Amino acid sequence: ENGGVIVVDGAQSAPHMTIDVQALDCDFFAFSGHKMCGPTGIGVLYGKRKWLEEMEPVEFGGEMIDFVELYDSTWKELPWKFEAGTPNIAGAIALGHAIDYLQELGMDNIHRYEEELAAYVLPKLQAIDGLTVYGPQDPNFRTGVIAFNLDGLHPHDVATALDMEGVAVRAGHHCAQPLLKYLEVSATARASFYFYNTTQDADRLVEAIMATKEFFKHGTI
């Protein structure tokens, strides 16, 4: 309504559910490859043709130039004007296969399974004294990505202690500092369940958090 451009960071949603950019009506949608079982160093950017045609290239090199003059150049049609030089060929092939694999599993099936895992583990996490789970408390309104904090402990310390228990989580800002500022927290720990995780993994997380609480009973390191 006000002429703003809507850019969606879909790195944490594209791997977990069906995405329809037409229904979202966003101007841009971006996601990374490694969160979709693909390789690092590659991602996907969707953009409405209107904006992509207006934008100037940000990198320059072979295959994106139409004509070169002494003081000016013209660019090829979309998408080539944004794909300068030798692309990450191996990464593109690998990401394509990863996306095909997820499509074969079915994004709706993945989302449904994650909801089941969330429904299993959320009550267990919510029952831990001093633990705050961020986001919807109803598993029907979330994926398997669960951000949390333990009272009085920095998420980095929590992540280190969980690692000692054999449980890998992410700790930090998660590229969402404005949201964390709104929540009035410096950072969070984040457990990410996916289609390859099980209820046994969920139980292991809960056990590791309880062990972490015991470890820090007398204060941080």
Residue ranges and their predicted role:
Residues 1-221:
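Pyridoxal 5′-phosphate
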